[in-house]
């Protein structure tokens, strides 16, 4: 068996690959697209690595071109880096799913080893091969916490809450601990991490990376084979080689001091502010999570920045456990619906999954093209979407409090929003995007993960960002977001009745005059219908009043 050439002729990548046979290694490991690190392996002697590019998987949904470039270039760089260590590599390209070439490889290579796939989707694809013994599945060493830590502190069934798990992990690992007590006397410093950015500290420039011949070849391939996908094929701001990912890790030290206080801030002056942009590296294991945490806990920086970043890393473990223990939420007894389509509205033909997905509030509107780059007229939304279309990324507050918030207020079908995040963001995989969007960004899971929905009106966005100053809508006189906020609670008041966390909000909603309630609903309908037609919003005297 020899690896398959990625391009006909002697391309930059194919010309550097070597042929190999089953006898070149005593054991062979299949490493998927998100396990690209030899340090995951128990040993590196007498092993061989199998990597597979699946065009069918890449066309399963409308992935951003930069996400495709990122995955493919990292796989190819990793293959060459592995070869440089005298470890044989079988590199297969296929227009089938991963299981077909693996089944063929098993005929020559025998049973192949594999760490348990992080993504449920990949586990389902490979399940028959595992049952048949063609793949020998091992625990995934990339996770920092065993599942029993989760079940012993959180449980096997909802409601799932993070706090006890977070404390257990801190104590077990000794991260920012003095004996059994947290450094600083408390586990959470979240209250210190809510400052808006007013320009008082200049954020560093995001890392940029040299484009090499492997990157160039991948960019050309993506433009040729995936022309119908959204976004622009670029890699200058994404790490692809081992050296690039070391540079990405070094950037963490540059931003960590001010990460905490400005963790929730947004500004048109800087997309990243003091965020590390490391999620894309760690989610494919080019940088290991323990490497990141080691930098954080040893850093000489304010405690609120250390604890805030550590909390993000433990949240990553937490959502993985939630997703796995609920079988991707398929085992939960929650009202579910079948999405209209699985492309989040992007004009592309894909195999349509007809299964039901959580939709606690029965939200059924289609995602508007404003999420794919058409101008909405709201500066906060247009800024966030522009960042996604340009870089396949924003930090977590625009994701939660702009993109997800506005989708919730517009009653967008939750699975469509989830599909959009998964396709559009370079760091999105099912185990992380589904809990974050279905469980937190929307209220699709009910109170399974959150006690109340994360929604806000104009005041929060005005406080934590600077979009209102340049927006056509006045924040208190004509912005549609606050009327939509109140319309949301009026529409779904029955679903929230009895929720003590929302008691004050519901009382305030009930006290609004009939005239205001009518304006709220009219605003909601005008915004959703205008955006559904691909049009931009304009300020109107009779609508959007917050007074």
Predicted regions and their residues:
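Alpha-helical membrane-anchoring segments
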Residues: 49-56, 77-80, 118-128, 135-180, ...
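A eukaryotic "domain-start" boundary segment
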Residues: 57, 172-283, 477, 481-482, ...
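N-terminal beta-strand-loop-alpha-helix module at the start
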Residues: 2-90
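Short beta->alpha junction loops
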Residues: 90-98
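C-terminal catalytic domain of photolyase/cryptochrome flavoproteins
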Residues: 4, 20-22, 32-33, 265, ...
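Beta-rich, aromatic/charged-enriched effector core domains that present basic-aromatic interfaces
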Residues: 11, 23, 97-238, 438
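Short, solvent-exposed loop/turn segments at secondary-structure junctions
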Residues: 35-37, 56-57, 119-120, 142-143, ...
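Short alpha-helical segments and helix-capping/turn motifs at coil-helix boundaries
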Residues: 13-17, 31-39, 99-105, 125, ...
